[in-house]
């Protein structure tokens, strides 16, 4: 397989979400360990992230809380991220992929404002795509069809990189793409132990492993 495009997820692939969820814990009034434990429990149980919020605050309304938070702290990062949250292997790995002649895209499940936040980082990528802008999110096959459309290459020439089996590896493979499972973040570690992780073309511990892996297959 001659890989021409590498497409990367955002949360826990490019962005370390520790600070983001720490701010949420503070907002919810619970210790960081408590909230992080709740998030991990939901990840292990295959339950949606929002269930962790509702566990520590029954009846939690995400949209209402974000709106109130924005009004109270208009100048803070709140539920968003910035360049300080970028994993240290991101820039070197993306640079190496670009220098190898590969198209590098970002496409992940994120709110609209994640687009400008990523653009502001000046990452060495060809384009940045956000689910809330597209109006379709992973694991919907339509998301991966859109990825292939934006890449302009055949699905088998695209490597999708993410930290989840359910949202990244399996739907990418169903779309005919290659898939890399990144073993970091709560989901990355948990999902690397699932039997379905074997569907990934490669499991990596760092983005730094990608340029060499792709080069060996071109």
Task: Cite the ranges covered by each PLM segment.
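N-terminal helical cap/lid subdomain that shapes the substrate entry/recognition surface
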Residues: 1-102, 111-115, 124
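Asp-based, Mg2+/Mn2+-dependent phosphohydrolase catalytic module
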Residues: 1-6, 91-218
């Amino acid at each position: 397989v001659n890989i021409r495009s590498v497409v990367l997820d955002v949360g826990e692939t490019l962005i370390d979400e520790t600070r983001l969820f720490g701010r949420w814990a503070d907002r919810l009034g619970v210790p960081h360990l408590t909230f992080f434990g709740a998030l991990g429990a939901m990840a292990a149980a295959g339950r949606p992230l929002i269930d962790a919020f509702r566990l520590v605050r029954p009846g939690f309304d995400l949209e209402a809380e974000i709106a109130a938070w924005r009004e109270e702290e208009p100048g803070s990062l709140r539920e968003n991220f910035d360049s300080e949250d970028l994993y240290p292997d991101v820039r070197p790995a993306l640079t190496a992929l670009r220098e190898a002649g590969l198209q590098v895209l970002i496409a992940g499940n994120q709110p609209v404002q994640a687009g400008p936040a990523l653009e502001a980082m000046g990452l060495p990528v060809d384009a940045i795509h956000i689910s809330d802008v597209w109006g379709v999110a992973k694991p919907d096959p339509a998301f991966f069809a859109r990825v292939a459309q934006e890449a302009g290459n055949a699905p088998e020439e695209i490597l999708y990189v993410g930290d989840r089996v359910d949202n990244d590896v399996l739907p990418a493979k169903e779309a005919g793409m290659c898939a890399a499972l990144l073993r970091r973040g709560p989901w990355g570690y948990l999902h690397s132990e699932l039997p379905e992780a074997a569907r990934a073309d490669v499991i990596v511990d760092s983005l730094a492993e990608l340029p060499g892996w792709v080069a060996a297959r071109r």
